[in-house]
Swiss-Prot record:
Domain of life according to the entry: Eukaryota
Name listed for the protein in its UniProt record: Zinc metalloproteinase/disintegrin-like CdtV1
Lineage: Eukaryota, Metazoa, Chordata, Craniata, Vertebrata
Quaternary structure annotation from Swiss-Prot or TrEMBL: Monomer.
Chief location bin: secreted
Keyword Nucleotide-binding attached: no
Tissues expressing this chain: Expressed by the venom gland.
InterPro entries according to UniProt: Disintegrin_dom, Disintegrin_dom_sf
Origin species: Crotalus durissus terrificus (South American rattlesnake)
Keyword Secreted: yes
Single GO molecular function: toxin activity
GO cellular component terms attached to this protein's record: extracellular region
Length: 32
């Protein structure tokens, strides 16, 4: 399963808000 990021939150610790891409080695949206 591929995890996509929301490009809305700049404070998102797992995604780059500027590029809307997941940061390397980050696990988000698991159990949310």
């Amino acid at each position: 399963a591929r995890i996509e990021c929301d490009c809305g939150s700049i404070e998102n610790p797992c995604c780059y808000a500027t590029t809307c891409k997941l940061r390397p080695g980050s696990q988000c949206a698991e159990g949310m």
